[in-house]
């Protein structure tokens, strides 16, 4: 819902930080792209622009594209071969961009993904005398395509149907996502450097909001958008882990360059819609990087639908603090919360004794008391929670909690319109 970004802007303005607000908005309110094109509307998009490949290395780009592939589907062999094709495509395209001083983009990768495009890129490398390390991935892939004759690489009209069909099986793994991204969200994905540099957003403590639609796109598209952002984020954090061993701390320890008084907070809302195993890996590493990861989900089952129960359990174990809100049944989510809270010894009276008197009978406590181990959180306690109420589980203690309520009147202002921070491109 668009009030999330608007509320964040007003609250940021209250603290003088509205200039730090950045937004990647994939929501379009169900508007028809065809109607917008036909009407000739030239208004600026309700979003900053983003090129996830502008400053990425080959590994970053390949991993980001791999995250677009559907998960938990049949045809794993085709996906493995598609990943190999993707790495050859990315390496060749990236080297060409570096050599020619161009900016790699989603649209450029899509153009080169065809068999003709990869063959043309290979021929360009031969003509321009690229280094062997740069041209080898393209040559190795083309040689591995069944039915492809390297002697005919410059004459596509002489190719047989078999290599085209084999390559189409591989590129087809990416075609649905690429088509959706380029056509539906083409105004967000920039062909140049774009407005948003996620590494700058993290290291400069900016407030970056990513808005992903849930109702007007397929579950796969929603998941692919979320996984792409998470992959970009995790690969950028990987840089901060460092790799240099020789030199002083100032030269080698990347994370100390950006260390502040407080960790950078990243909130992944409805994480079950785009969960990837990279999130579990992030949870094991972020503490050493001055990075705080907050994940929210309606239920555990949706996360397990994207991965295995084992990976979900690993994620839960790496979540140092857990917040449990209202639930509706005693399912896996409730059991996970109960296990996290642990048990405590409680005294229970075993019986009541009846005493007959002049005025009638009465009941008094019995003489036996039993000590039983019971969960610190009862399912009924979770079911009876109201809006804004939750339990905090921290270091084995269960703390009844309530969120801070901010009235709507203090979260907006009719006389002060929201403005997206637009940036001016400057040639380096």
Give the positions of each predicted feature.
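Hydrophobic packing residues within well-ordered alpha-helices of enzyme cores
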Residues: 7-11, 303, 337
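Conserved H-loop
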Residues: 298-302
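P-loop NTPase motor core of the ASCE superfamily
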Residues: 73-81, 197-198, 281-284, 304-428
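Short hydrophobic alpha-helical runs that function as membrane-insertion/retention elements
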Residues: 1, 21-25, 292-297, 322-326, ...
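P-loop NTPase motor domains
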Residues: 1-291, 380-386, 390-400, 411, ...
């Amino acid at each position: 819902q668009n009030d999330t970004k608007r509320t964040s802007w007003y609250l940021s303005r209250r603290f003088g930080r509205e200039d730090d607000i950045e937004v990647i908005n994939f929501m379009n309110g169900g508007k028809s792209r065809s109607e917008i094109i036909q009407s000739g509307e030239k208004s600026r998009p309700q979003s900053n622009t983003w090129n996830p490949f502008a400053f990425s290395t080959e590994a970053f780009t390949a991993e980001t594209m791999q995250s677009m592939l559907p998960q938990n589907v049949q045809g794993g062999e085709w996906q493995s071969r598609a990943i190999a094709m993707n790495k050859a495509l990315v390496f060749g395209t990236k080297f060409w961009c570096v050599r020619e001083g161009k900016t790699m983009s989603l649209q450029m990768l899509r153009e080169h993904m065809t068999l003709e495009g990869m063959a043309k890129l290979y021929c360009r490398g031969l003509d321009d005398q690229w280094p062997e390390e740069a041209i080898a991935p393209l040559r190795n892939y083309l040689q591995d395509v069944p039915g492809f004759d390297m002697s005919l690489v410059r004459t596509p009209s002489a190719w047989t149907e078999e290599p085209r069909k084999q390559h189409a099986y591989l590129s087809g793994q990416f075609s649905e996502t690429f088509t959706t991204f380029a056509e539906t969200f083409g105004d967000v994905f920039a062909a140049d450097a774009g407005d948003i540099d996620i590494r700058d957003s993290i290291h400069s403590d900016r407030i970056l909001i990513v808005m992903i639609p849930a109702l007007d796109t397929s579950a796969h598209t929603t998941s692919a958008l979320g996984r792409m952002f998470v992959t970009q984020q995790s690969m950028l954090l990987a840089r901060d882990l460092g790799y240099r061993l020789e030199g002083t701390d100032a030269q080698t320890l990347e994370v100390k360059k950006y260390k502040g008084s407080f960790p950078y907070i990243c909130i992944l809302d409805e994480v079950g819609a785009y969960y990837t195993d990279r999130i579990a890996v992030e949870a094991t590493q972020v503490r050493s990087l001055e990075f705080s990861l907050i994940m929210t989900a309606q239920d555990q089952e949706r996360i397990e639908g994207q991965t295995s129960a084992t990976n979900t359990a690993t994620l839960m174990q790496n979540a140092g603090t857990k917040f449990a809100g209202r639930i509706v049944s005693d399912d896996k989510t409730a059991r996970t919360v109960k296990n996290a809270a642990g048990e405590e010894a409680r005294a229970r009276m075993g019986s009541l004794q009846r005493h007959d008197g002049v005025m009638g009978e009465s009941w008094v406590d019995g003489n036996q008391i039993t000590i039983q181990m019971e969960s610190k959180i009862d399912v009924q306690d979770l079911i009876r929670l109201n809006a804004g109420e939750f339990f905090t589980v921290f270091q084995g203690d269960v703390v009844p909690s309530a969120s801070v309520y901010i009235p709507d009147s203090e979260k907006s202002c009719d006389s002060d319109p929201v403005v997206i921070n637009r940036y001016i491109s400057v040639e380096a």
